[in-house]
Curated annotation (Swiss-Prot):
Gene3D superfamilies: Aconitase, domain 4. InterPro entries: Aconitase/3IPM_dehydase_swvl, AconitaseA/IPMdHydase_ssu_swvl, LeuD, LeuD_type2/HacB/DmdB. PANTHER family: 3-ISOPROPYLMALATE DEHYDRATASE SMALL SUBUNIT 1, 3-ISOPROPYLMALATE DEHYDRATASE SMALL SUBUNIT 2-RELATED-RELATED. The lineage of its organism: Bacteria, Thermotogati, Deinococcota, Deinococci, Deinococcales. Pathway: Amino-acid biosynthesis; L-leucine biosynthesis; L-leucine from 3-methyl-2-oxobutanoate: step 2/4. Residues 157-177 are annotated as: Disordered. This is 3-isopropylmalate dehydratase small subunit 1. Belongs to the LeuD family. LeuD type 2 subfamily. Catalyzes the isomerization between 2-isopropylmalate and 3-isopropylmalate, via the formation of 2-isopropylmaleate. Keywords: Amino-acid biosynthesis, Branched-chain amino acid biosynthesis, Leucine biosynthesis, Lyase. Its EC number is 4.2.1.33.
Amino acid sequence: MPRIWKFGDSVNTDDILPGKFAPFMAGEDVFQTFAFHYVRPEFAAQVQPGDVLIGGRNWGLGSSREYAPQALKKLHIGGIVAPSFARIHYRNLLNLGIPAFEYDLTELLEDGDEVTLDAQTGLLTYADGTVQLPPPPEFLREALKEGSILEFFKKHGRFPGEEPGAEASTETASAAE
């Protein structure tokens, strides 16, 4: 069963994946094994698909390096819940199909607690009950069904939330490639 990994306030992108372990430095196939290398050295070896990260305020601040959320995607993180996110990092998470919920669970759940998170509805279930997180917007639920916004675009030829049958502009299509 998925479990909680709890972090504090102001977890930055270098905490998530230190720059010296970026894909071009460590290698495309292994860079995710350095996730939280200095903050939680055991993380990459012990994290399981579907595990949920609980953070404090301002999760993902710092540089806009996309390889930090890419490492979490490669580790199959089930979602991240924090009271607030750095906006660029939040958008990178959504672009990659990593559910991110703005909600404060820091007092409710502890490291290692077993949970299930329904990314489509935002329903988080734990031993003592459930919490209804703010559900993702419809466009994101569409993207999550395909794995990410890019995968949705590749399959449907449009972005989530756009009307089916509406052609993406040349500018929009070029940006997705």
